[in-house]
Amino acid sequence: MEPREAAGKETMGSKKKNLTFLRSRLYMLERRKTDTVVDSSVSGDHSGSLRRSQSDRTEYNQKLQEKMTPQAECSSAETPTPEDEQQVGRMMAKRAKIIRELIQTERDYLTDLELCLREVVQPLRSKQIDRLDVEGLFSNIESVHQISAKLLSLLEEATTDVEPAMQVIGEVFLQIKGPLEDIYKIYCYHHDEAHSVLESYEKEEELKQHLSHCLQSLKNIYLQEGKPNLLDMGSLMIKPIQRVMKYPLLLCELRNSTPPSHPDYRALGEAFAAVKDINVNINELKRRKDLVLKYKKNEEEESLKDKLSKLNIHSISKKSKRVTNHLKILTRGESQVKDNTFNREEKLFRSLEKTVRLCVKNISSCLQHIEEATPFTLQSGAELREISYQDGEKNGTEPQDQASKPYQDFAARSQRLILNPLSALLSLFPGPQKLIQKRYDKLLDYNSSLPRSATTESDLAKREYEALNAQLVEELQAFNQAAKTILLNCLCSFVTLLRDLMQVALQAYSTVKTVPLPVLGISEIQSRVLEEVHSLTFVKENSATFIERKLSFEKKKPAQILPEVPHQTDAHRSKLLSTYGAEELYRAKRKCNATQEHDINLLEGELVAVLEQKDPLGSTSRWFVDTGCVKGYVYSSFLKPHNPGKGQKVDADNRFCDDDFENISLFVSCRPAGDRVSISDSSSSLSGSCGKFETNGADADNFQEVDEQIFYAVHAFQARSDHELSLQEYQRVHILRFCDLSGNKEWWLAEAQGQKGYVPANYLGKMTYA
């Protein structure tokens, strides 16, 4: 012992000579009482051999390695004093006591769960009482029982036949923290609802007797086993919540009772943080739910007194800040916190709400119309049945009430399978809509608090927004998925019911004689019948309309093909520059296509010489120009002066109009001169000709051909007969006549893509320029 006493008297500097010195001292400290020295006379020689078994040497080397960890080297290099050893001993004793308490309380808790399942949950579930919701009362208590059993088995495995110095409890909680949080989250989330359901059950005598019977049997078992008396069903249901809140307390106390050199110290710290986070997450989930329930309360349930009590300086100030922040966002004066997931789900939510509402409205209207049309349909069917049979043939007519039975079944099944689910789904949308609006209010509060420093008010706004946003994102996804499923199922059911109704109707009238299909087309047959009708005396005056329109349509007018104009070359431009003055030269601002007879095509930048600033009809919008290779008419809006000096003298306002509005296609009225104003000064002959047919009723051959006018289809039009012309939206058409053969100006004779026919005049529009 002389070297140890000498080492105790040395200073701190002399104690840290080298690593060999420390190892020799630790070696002496780790010697056990059963170790024997070969030569007891050798006191100062530390290199003496020891007489030890191989197992003792292995255990000794493990302990020595633990002592030589960096913690041991950095904490203190001096030999532990007896007081330190006593302190470590007391901590280890307290640690062992806490571990025993942890395992025993977990075992008692698991026993309580087993008794609850055996004596309460299973008997109530086996009775199958209609008004008693066992799942609503106890939620996922079976999962809570399973996770508790798993935790207990892991704790027993970590402590059984393991020395106290080697027991690691923290790793057990780190291993099970994931499922532990998920299961207790569900139970704690539904506990408040379960408590409310329990209170409602206790108000009904029959349900209260069933609960009291199960609770009494459980109390008897508690008395037999000497456990604390069970107060009521609520104290049994709250046990899982109390248990999960006790885990952080036990682990914190266990960590404080564990020496820093113990291998479980670091794991206990991580386990304590993990179970603490579990409780924080459970409380946050509970707070989110309370926040949703707070804002989900309907305003109709609030009295006038409650509404007035909310009106104060703080509420007025908060709302004014929201309005100000909203205006800043609209004017892009302030950035906004965005959540793309929420925006996507909100858009889908609003689309689903609109679709469901329209489906309910349209399907209800469809059922009503079918109901109104059913009597007439049955009557028409009976009459067709009579017509299809010749005299003397058997005509079995079924009763009216029996014939209407398929529709009654269709209406009843539609109400049950389609309208009822859709109406129930539609009633669920107002709640989320109100929460979405409240979420936007909290977002405005959060945005307004961002520029300011962290305060209690800003932290509260942030937490409320994040809680409400997270709750909406999570539940909107589930709601939208369920709503889409219900909507698609209802639409498929509606289509199936309509198909079944048509099949029943077809089978009901399958005995009606089938009419052979005509060899000629149906349009030709109809035309022949109409010709026979027009030969009658009392319709003979109006017969010219149909026949003349048919003859006019059958006349084929050869399509006019505009000749291809050669493009301008450098020689052509040189010719123009040498022949004409600078004030007569213009350039094409953009490509111009020929739209009328005697028009020419121009490419952007081509040089032209203006010969005359009007057309033969006197219109100044079309100029007669020379490109050096061809002469023709071009709209003046496509030209700009070639002389740069002249272009600079143009007024600023005129430049603004030319540059900013030259690419806009402005549609003007498509009416001819007979309604408002003439198309041009020279088109009065067209108006006169149309008016002459109205007043004099002359023959169709007296119509005068007018120049082709280029118009565009403002709306798409689908032809209903062979005499009409189908048009696509924005399709260019040639107008051949501005009225039909009877003088009706509502229908024009048009030509498009080699096809001719009549189109409604109000479907056409003319551009200000080509």
Curated annotation (Swiss-Prot):
Which PROSITE patterns does its entry note? BAR (PS51021), DH_2 (PS50010), SH3 (PS50002)
Alphabetical list of Pfam families matching this protein = BAR, RhoGEF, SH3_2, SH3_9
Q: Where is the SH3 domain?
A: 581-644, 706-769
| Sequence ranges assigned to domain DH in this UniProt record | 94-285
SMART domains given in the database record:
BAR (SM00721), RhoGEF (SM00325), SH3 (SM00326)
GO molecular-function annotation terms? guanyl-nucleotide exchange factor activity
- Annotated BAR domain residues: 327-542
Which terms in the GO cellular component ontology are assigned? Answer: cytoplasm
Q: Which residues carry this modification: Phosphothreonine?
A: T34
**Gene3D superfamilies according to UniProt:** Arfaptin homology (AH) domain/BAR domain, Dbl homology (DH) domain, SH3 Domains
Q: Which PANTHER family match?
A: NUCLEAR FUSION PROTEIN FUS2 (PTHR22834), RHO GUANINE NUCLEOTIDE EXCHANGE FACTOR 38 (PTHR22834:SF17)
What this protein is called in its record is Rho guanine nucleotide exchange factor 38
Identify the species of origin.
Mus musculus
